[in-house]
Amino acid sequence: MKLVVCFPGIGYHCDKPLLYYSRKLAACAGYDHTLLLQYTYHKDGLRGCPAALREAFDTLYTQAETQLSAVDWPQYDDVLFLSKSIGTAVSAAFAQRHGIPCRQILYTPLSLTFALAPQNALAFLGTADPWSDAFSVAAAARANGTPLCLYENANHSLETLSLIHI
């Protein structure tokens, strides 16, 4: 059996494009079980405030622990964590703390993500992402051995102003 687990961001739920289409692709690749996490967090002032971001991470991590507590991880032959924004830190921490042998897709990771040393990961980030210093995150990804696809002028949803480049 193959399991895909989606770790959303705070304002980016699992039915938004990056996570929605990624899990559809995972299903096409044979992932026959899916878990979609949901978070409740309503505080403002996270951007640019490491202490507030860490508090949010701690809250979301606790919620993820609760939602994933009944999973029998050894029954799965293959586990894929799809994560977005602060969810990338939650997924990295969860895999590390529980020794989950998984692959990870990290959409728009934060600096905090690489402090948690995600393993078997591939990351995607835009240079115009207001939540991340793209070049600092790129350096952290490199130091962690995580391949990073960096998209010029893409925002926190990996969108650009121009969809057509000629």
Identify the meaning behind each predicted range.
Residues 2-75:
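Serine-hydrolase catalytic machinery in alpha/beta-hydrolase-like enzymes
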Residues 128-132:
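Acidic catalytic loop of the alpha/beta-hydrolase fold
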Residues 33-35, 143-159:
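Catalytic histidine neighborhood in serine/cysteine hydrolases
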Residues 164-166:
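Conserved small/polar residues in nucleotide/adenosyl-binding loops
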Residues 100-109:
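A conserved short beta-strand
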Residues 123-125:
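Short beta-strand/loop motif that positions the catalytic acidic residue
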Residues 82-91:
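Gly/Ala-rich beta-loop-alpha elbow adjacent to hydrolase catalytic centers
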